[in-house]
């Protein structure tokens, strides 16, 4: 089964939300208190997905707000260098800064992030800074859950979703739950549900769907039944090492297993998964193959130091899939 888009659109994907700075520990297996050197990368889920999509050959654009400083200029320059259109990235003139994420890599199983997100520029994207014509010219709009955490970014995203629905642009909601940006579980559930019910494709981990539903131990069947009663026609639920599932409105269920790899760190997997899954759909692969692309891409990124810089090319993804299938005798 294949997923179809309006092929008359110029952009394959336009993402909206945060673009920030990742400072990843260059010294492994030690606590942050003892870490002295970090490597700088562009971070933020929607920015990573846009970068990953561009590296896979898709035409990607980005809507967001950056600070008027060295970090802001680095973000724009880096994304442009990776092929992302940044014409809709506005500059904050009020002195707000980029979000900073310091990562600690104690072991492949124990990684943590120290996040600085107070009064950051990306959460001050105004609805008036969302261009209708730009979104209307995309096959899909990628929305990140974190952008819903505060106003005015929240209203800017809701406006973008409204525009997409108006112009036959598929809405892809990457749940991207980050607890440090939200005031309460109830608030998170309200806004996640609001956008999920308007989305054509919803992607997240089982835990993130539980956050959206404000409960624990939820089941996939109940989740997809609720979303299919609204706008969704494809729901992807990830279960970590147990693989991922895609549920279609027509009743079909697809599964991809997680690919074995030497894990360096745990962050970045979700963004690389989303970009490769989207690439698979846009390039005309069937849903099961797109799931495999997502799983393979995630396994590549968790084996490397960065998230955005480690986003693989299509050839790397296909090579890994073929190698694993050969190893498994398939």
Curated annotation (Swiss-Prot):
Reactions catalysed according to its record: 5-dehydro-2-deoxy-D-gluconate + ATP = 6-phospho-5-dehydro-2-deoxy-D-gluconate + ADP + H(+)
Enzyme nomenclature, EC number: 2.7.1.92
Statement: the UniProt record of this protein carries the keyword Nucleotide-binding: yes
Enzymatic class: transferase
Gene3D superfamilies given in the database record: 3.40.1190.20, putative 5-dehydro-2- deoxygluconokinase
Any Pfam family: PfkB
Pathway: Polyol metabolism; myo-inositol degradation into acetyl-CoA; acetyl-CoA from myo-inositol: step 5/7
GO molecular function, one term: 5-dehydro-2-deoxygluconokinase activity
The protein's role, per its UniProt record: Catalyzes the phosphorylation of 5-dehydro-2-deoxy-D-gluconate (2-deoxy-5-keto-D-gluconate or DKG) to 6-phospho-5-dehydro-2-deoxy-D-gluconate (DKGP).
Family listed: Belongs to the carbohydrate kinase PfkB family.
Protein name in the entry: 5-dehydro-2-deoxygluconokinase
Gene it is expressed from: iolC
